[in-house]
């Protein structure tokens, strides 16, 4: 059965500001019916790539976290590391980026946990019941360790998925680095030779012996490679790369099945704001003008 969707516009006046309006919306939509008492509550959001200003302000996260804490819950803000090079590729840089963009205990009232760990390989394989494109989703461990899951996102364009919102925030956002590779890539990783220093880290972490060091450079044997993506996470020079060759249709199908893996069988609540609808996702280190006004 389809869930009810509750809507409130972004108009405000001196009687009620937008944070108060969001609190009223959460109450009306039944978020208060969830048993938060002594529960670990993951609030999944995007902290924004440094340089981007379209991400949701920390004030929104604080409103949600306060709602949870008032009902005895233990909220934390979370996201997983990125597959590409940037300010959120590992947990240390990711947390620095989050704090640079205003997220922290003082501003949001709760802690930050990067769900897939230091290098993006702390994951749980979650069976996707009825999955056609994904049989076992690779999800950041802290996401699955949480008792309650809340997604907080804003709508925006996306150059591959078309648009990004609740599903992309959950499906792609909760995937570990290997999970993101599975969604974006139809094949297996390769080594960019000019970046490789022949350190052998990829070979050490591979359970299948796929990376081979030849003449001081790594080469991946695709007959042995199973596409787990651990070599991408471990490479100190970002030399192990994917082809980004999955079709848009299959990418969206995989995102949907990854989302199913995250939300199945536990209390969830989803908040989407049609605000700062930038043409590209918040993973960019810049944001263009919104393509539509706030709703």
Identify what each model region corresponds to.
Residues 2-61, 66-79, 84-295:
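Extended, low-polarity segments enriched in aliphatic/aromatic residues
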